[in-house]
Amino acid sequence: MSRQLYPIDILGEHKVSSDFLVVELKRDRASDAVVGQTLRYMGWIKEHLCYSTQDVTGCIIAQQKDDKLDYALRQLNTVQFMRFEVDFRLIL
């Protein structure tokens, strides 16, 4: 099956190496379930978009991660976690 069934939040391509980066965004806390989701997207990209010289990495971005996600990511060198902060103020 070559049709992608789920939308990827952000798909980037490196300017020099042409490697792909799959970015999965989570609004609040990310758990280990997001690892499977990210790996599924990465697998699809590797199978359907990559040339033999291209690699795919993943990045999960959320405000927090739980312990389960931390343990799962320790076993993967192709997926990383990054935390974001938002400071939003309306000023009149």
Residue ranges with predicted function:
Residues 1-92:
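Charged, terminal alpha-helix-loop-beta segments
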